[in-house]
């Protein structure tokens, strides 16, 4: 029973970290990276499609992204979606391809991006601590109902805290790497 709870806790915290990584992907580091456009949704064919479902995105060099639109009639919608994503990008249409030259990051922009990263990391840490709280309540309830012994309760409590600490450290480490990437490129 406790092993099940630990496994479920690890899984929930891993999903939180994956969500944090997804949030971080959308933050520019100063180098062209196809994942920068991952969150863009295109209004097309009477619905909404993710950009990667209507075009291929690749980095040509450190400063340039290429968006190869598969359906030439959709090029305008794709360009508008990129503009409306508020990423401070200026897409240029060249046939079936949209070229995006990434502007250099100013120090002010870098600091804003780092602030945003800190917000994402704090949200992840709060989510991890909330998961810990839920699990702790669950094992306290089990102890109260005599489903587990006092010793098992204390062991489980310590293990859940260790899992929590490991995951918070992972968030902090990943934040530090991304922050250095933004500030030093």
Swiss-Prot record:
Protein biosynthesis listed as a keyword: yes
Keywords carried by this UniProt record: Cytoplasm, Protein biosynthesis
UniProt key word Protein biosynthesis: yes
Compartments where found: Cytoplasm
Main subcellular location: cytoplasm
Any single GO CC term annotated in Swiss-Prot or TrEMBL for this entry: cytosol
InterPro entries: Ribosome_recyc_fac, Ribosome_recyc_fac_dom, RRF_sf
Alphabetical list of CDD domains matching this protein: RRF
One of the protein's GO biological processes: cytoplasmic translational termination
GO molecular function: ribosomal large subunit binding
Function per UniProt: Responsible for the release of ribosomes from messenger RNA at the termination of protein biosynthesis. May increase the efficiency of translation by recycling ribosomes from one round of translation to another.
Entry's family note: Belongs to the RRF family.
PANTHER family, per database record: MITOCHONDRIAL RIBOSOME RECYCLING FACTOR PSEUDO 1, RIBOSOME RECYCLING FACTOR
Stored NCBIfam families: frr (TIGR00496)
Protein name, entry field: Ribosome-recycling factor
Organism: Wolbachia pipientis subsp. Culex pipiens (strain wPip)
Name of encoding gene: frr
């Amino acid at each position: 029973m406790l092993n099940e709870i630990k496994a479920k806790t690890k899984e929930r915290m891993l999903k939180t970290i994956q969500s944090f990584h997804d949030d971080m992907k959308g933050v520019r580091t100063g180098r062209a990276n196809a994942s920068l456009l991952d969150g863009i949704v295109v209004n097309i064919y009477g619905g909404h499609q993710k950009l990667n479902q209507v075009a291929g995105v690749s980095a040509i060099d450190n400063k340039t992204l290429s968006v190869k639109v598969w359906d030439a009639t959709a090029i305008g919608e794709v360009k508008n979606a990129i503009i409306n994503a508020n990423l401070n990008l200026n897409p240029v249409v060249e046939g079936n391809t949209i070229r995006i030259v990434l502007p250099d990051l100013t120090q002010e922009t870098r600091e804003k991006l780092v602030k945003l990263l800190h917000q994402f990391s704090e949200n992840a840490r709060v989510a991890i601590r909330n998961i810990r709280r839920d699990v702790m309540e669950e094992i306290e309830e089990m102890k109260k109902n005599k489903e587990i012994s006092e010793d098992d309760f204390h062991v489980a409590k310590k293990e859940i805290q260790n899992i929590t600490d490991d995951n918070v450290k992972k968030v902090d480490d990943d934040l530090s790497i991304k922050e250095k990437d933004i500030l030093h490129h």
